[in-house]
Amino acid sequence: MGNSKYKILVLSDLKETTNYALQNAVKVSKVIDAEIEFFHVKKPTDIVNTDSQLSAMRSINKEYVVTEKKINELIAPIIENESITIHSSFAFGNIKNEIENHINSCKPDVIILGSRKRKILSFVGDKIINFVLKSHKKTLIIVSNGTDFDFEKEFSLDFLKQGRRVIQA
């Protein structure tokens, strides 16, 4: 896909819905001829467990290699089977700040997120989905586990939330 007019950003936590989000991103990109960008953020507190600076640096370097390998293992089969390019990147830091910075720098037209399974006692909800909904006026596709949506057929499964399109696939 040489000169694409549109950009799709897949935001992932590298958990169960990541594969579905990527598959749906590929389907959407074929329909609208878009580039796909994959982005993952991890909190530093999930990586570093010690107070020692040297151990912290070691943990960060190890997690960098592990995360890069995980992302490549996820993306490589899709790139090979679909003959498309997927640009990937990841960051360690404050999740909301890193997502906001990446969205501002890449300027996507469509953002695809995977939704988590609802917990029985969930009072707050999914903070990242709500954050993206409130702070960015882009088309947002929220993919749940097991979703295999056919974007080539006509559909009207979208609804307006806060004055913009949100598609729940």
Enumerate the predicted regions with their spans.
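Gly/Ser-rich helix-loop-strand patches that form or flank binding pockets
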Residues: 102-152, 159-161
